[in-house]
């Protein structure tokens, strides 16, 4: 439905096609934007300031394929003395990897299973090539997080509300006929 606002010589009215009752708060202080914000703070309280590091530079790209690649980016920023407050691990659980998703953090490369065909059968081809690069220096998700923190940065893992048809969640929800009828990625 629609809501209407009218302000004329007879007065100010607000009406709604669907609402039968509404509560309105009119905020006015001294006619300035700061005055309006002051009036809102009187009603809601003052918002807490975010920590300073949240307002700094955050490095994000489509994805980092390994913990070593992510750590290498942090290293390069530090080497070049470029300020870096956070780094984002994005979307590696997408696609065919049934072991890395919103529920499981078990990419075969991270948990030293790259030589196990059961763990790598759905692994994208570009990640299979990593087998030849030797042992990773960071051998677990915990080590990666500690490394980023030790180098004075924060880590954010981007989780999208999506999962591929190879994941355990997808198969379980499909059996229950509990999936919404639209395509997810991939």
Residue ranges: model-predicted function:
Residues 1-186:
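Catalytic-domain carbohydrate-binding cleft regions of carbohydrate-active enzymes
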């Amino acid at each position: 439905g629609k809501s209407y606002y009218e302000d004329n010589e007879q007065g100010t009215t607000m009406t709604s096609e669907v609402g039968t009752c509404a509560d309105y708060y009119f905020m006015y202080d001294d006619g300035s934007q700061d005055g309006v914000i002051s009036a809102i703070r009187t009603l809601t309280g003052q918002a807490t300031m975010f920590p300073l590091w949240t307002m700094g530079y955050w490095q994000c790209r489509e994805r980092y394929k390994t913990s070593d690649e992510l750590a290498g980016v942090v290293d390069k920023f530090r080497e070049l003395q470029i300020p870096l407050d956070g780094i984002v691990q994005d979307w590696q659980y997408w696609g065919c990897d049934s072991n890395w998703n919103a529920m499981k953090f078990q990419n075969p490369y991270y948990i030293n299973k790259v030589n196990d065909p059961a763990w790598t059968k759905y692994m994208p081809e570009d990640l299979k090539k990593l087998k030849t690069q030797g042992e990773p220096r960071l051998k677990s998700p915990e080590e990666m997080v500690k490394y980023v923190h030790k180098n004075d940065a924060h880590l954010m893992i981007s989780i999208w509300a999506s999962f591929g048809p190879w994941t355990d969640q997808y198969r379980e929800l499909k059996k229950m006929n509990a999936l919404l009828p639209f395509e997810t990625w991939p």
